[in-house]
Regions:
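Short, flexible loop/turn motifs enriched in small residues
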Residues: 6, 42-48, 245-249
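Compositionally biased, proline/threonine/alanine/serine-rich low-complexity intrinsically disordered stretches
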Residues: 23-44, 328, 380, 384-391, ...
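Active-site-adjacent loops and short helices of periplasmic peptidoglycan-processing enzymes
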Residues: 24-194, 198-203
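Domain-terminus/edge residues, biased toward the C-terminal soluble/receptor-binding domains
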Residues: 170-174, 182-187, 191-399
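C-terminal segment of classical bacterial N-terminal signal peptides
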Residues: 13-20
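Generic marker of residues within folded, mature protein domains
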Residues: 13, 40, 62, 89-91, ...
Length: 399
């Protein structure tokens, strides 16, 4: 991993950290991408698909292969929970609504070797218990019961998951089940997982508080939340772990410090201990080494563009949205900006029409481009102005 990110990771715990119970009970196979790396026991764990996001603005602070689709394992249960949260907000269900535990949900969830909440066949379970099972202990049986109860079948529920992903602009996402169990077509990028987590924080506070619960008891069984950040990183309050043989050990984590939220996503580690170590050190680095810089607020004018044959000679260029750039603190100190457009612009121009870009660049920063829109409607010139412009062009080009 890049030196800037792992500077904090070299200060490791002196003694071995006790692993928490994890979902899978099969021996773990090393992720394919890590198989060719030399074994260096003293080195810090090297996760794959790393995203560090500023949770307030959504700016990506650090990206390592963060846009590549990856197998998310149980981290995709964030979307499962979101679909349930949407139904609650729309008053289609309540927390007291009860769903039937079918043989399919029992056999493929409660009787599987993955995480489950010990649901009993043919029992009736409240959505309150089911959603806690999904969020706190990653229960596969609860996922299937919720999918069948809400949509009639897991496949119909998956269609809702994929439709919601499209609505949220999660372009890398494609889901094939409600649980995250292995499937080569069940993928999402770490950057899109971070965006999904940020959406949950902002729009489903009633569910989000469950992600910080340390344990859940159902049917006489108490299970602990596997999130290694809870209780170890100041301000940590979510979200979700994941593990399969194909994905390795991954984490979507979030924490708030000094009023600022950071969201962390990574995958591909070889053990729970590695996930714990990487999660703690990366989240600390997220607050200590990274920052954001606001370039402009939505609607702020950043320049003007020349207009050809318009009712006025220039168009005001304003920010379409808030413009925030994130990255290592040292990099942000050297930012440069400039406006680019293909001009002069040709009238008529609608107010809010994208007509230019603000380019942000600097040493060590990948160039970023943000849309600028016309702050005014600009009509076409009248016939006299057009005729005069025609004469001007004709005679200026005659010599």
């Amino acid at each position: 991993m890049k030196t800037a990110v792992w500077a904090a990771c070299l200060l490791l715990l002196a003694s071995a950290l006790p692993p928490a119970a994890d979902a899978a009970r099969r021996p773990h196979r090393v992720a394919r991408h890590a198989a060719h790396q030399p074994v260096q026991p003293a080195a810090a764990p090297q996760p794959l698909h790393v995203t560090i996001m500023d949770g307030d603005s959504g700016a990506i602070l650090h990206c390592e292969d963060c846009n590549a689709p990856m197998p998310p394992a149980s981290m995709s249960k964030l979307m499962t929970a979101l679909i349930v949260g949407d139904a609650l907000l729309q008053h289609r269900i309540t927390l007291d609504t009860r769903y039937h535990v079918s043989e399919n949900a029992w056999r493929h969830g409660a009787m599987s070797d993955g995480s489950h909440m010990f649901l009993e066949l043919n029992s009736e379970v409240s959505i309150r218990d089911l959603i806690q099972g999904v969020i706190v202990v990653s229960a596969n049986d609860a996922c299937i019961v919720l999918a069948e109860g809400l949509a009639g079948s897991e496949s119909a529920f998956v269609a809702l998951m994929n439709r919601r992903a499209q609505e949220l602009g999660l372009r890398s996402a494609h889901f094939t089940n409600a649980t995250g169990l292995p499937d080569p077509n069940h993928v999402i990028s770490s950057a899109d997982l971070a965006r999904l987590a940020r959406y949950l924080v902002a729009n489903h506070p009633e569910l989000y508080r469950l992600y910080g619960e340390r344990a859940f008891t159902y049917n006489g069984h108490t299970q602990e939340n596997r999130n290694p950040l809870l209780g170890t990183v100041a301000g940590a309050d979510g979200l979700k772990t994941g593990h399969t043989d194909d994905s390795g050990f991954g984490l979507v984590g979030s924490a708030v410090q000094n009023g600022h939220r950071r969201i962390l996503v990574f995958n591909g580690l070889r053990s729970m201990a590695d996930r714990r170590e990487a999660g703690i050190n990366l989240m600390r680095a997220a607050f200590e080494q990274y920052a954001t810089q606001r370039i402009a607020r939505r609607g702020q004018q950043l320049g003007e563009a020349q207009v050809y044959l318009g009712s006025r000679a220039t168009a005001p260029l304003v920010a379409q949205n808030d413009i925030v750039v994130g990255g290592p603190q040292a990099v942000l100190a050297g930012l440069r900006t400039h406006v680019v457009y293909a001009g002069p612009l040709r009238a008529p121009i609608a107010q809010g029409q994208v007509v230019a870009q603000l380019v942000v660049e600097g040493p060590g920063l990948q160039t970023k481009r943000f849309p600028l829109v016309s702050g005014q409607r600009i009509g076409g010139a009248n016939w006299f102005a057009k005729a005069w412009e025609g004469l001007r062009v004709t005679f200026s080009g005659a010599h």
